[in-house]
């Protein structure tokens, strides 16, 4: 049998479920990535951000003078709990399904989204967000962006970001 790797992203866009708020952490509705592969050594999924605020991924508003809401920790550092009332932005990855097939799915500590945490995105390079140790028959990851804002964050309805998500089998 030839090498096989299927990587299915559930959609191209992901909106926040409500307006960003100084009173709570707001999340997007999320997207899933489904991976099926016969790669004996598993698979890896990476992410890279488009917007950059001091070398950290960011939401950006054109109507607010290109204002950015960036992550607060270093890109690649362990994920953290966002602080209500302060500006922060990041990616939270969780495991929806560790399907049968032989490999064990693991989250990279930088983007581990369990317990309402998020990791600062990196606009300078692709960073791993999750991997598995063997073949997969439908492993599913959930990708959710989370953000908090401060009282002085400029009002705008066009805060956006673009992330590139890629994956590969480890043959």
Outline where the language-model segments fall.
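Signature of Gram-negative chaperone-usher
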Residues: 1-171
């Amino acid at each position: 049998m030839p090498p096989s790797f299927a990587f299915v992203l559930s959609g191209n866009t992901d909106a926040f479920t409500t307006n960003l708020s100084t009173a709570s952490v707001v999340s997007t509705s999320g997207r899933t990535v489904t991976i099926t592969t016969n790669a004996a050594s598993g698979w890896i999924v990476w992410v890279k951000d488009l917007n950059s605020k001091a070398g950290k991924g960011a939401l950006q508003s054109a109507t607010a003078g290109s204002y950015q809401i960036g992550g607060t920790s270093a890109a690649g550092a362990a994920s953290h709990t966002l602080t209500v009332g302060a500006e922060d932005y990041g990616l939270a990855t969780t495991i929806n399904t560790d399907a049968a097939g032989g490999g064990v799915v693991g989250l990279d500590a930088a983007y581990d989204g369990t317990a309402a945490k998020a990791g600062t995105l990196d606009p300078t390079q692709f960073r791993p967000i999750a991997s598995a140790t063997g073949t997969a028959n439908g492993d599913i990851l959930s990708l959710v962006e989370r953000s908090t804002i401060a009282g002085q964050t400029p009002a705008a309805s066009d805060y956006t970001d673009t992330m590139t998500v890629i994956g590969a089998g480890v043959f």
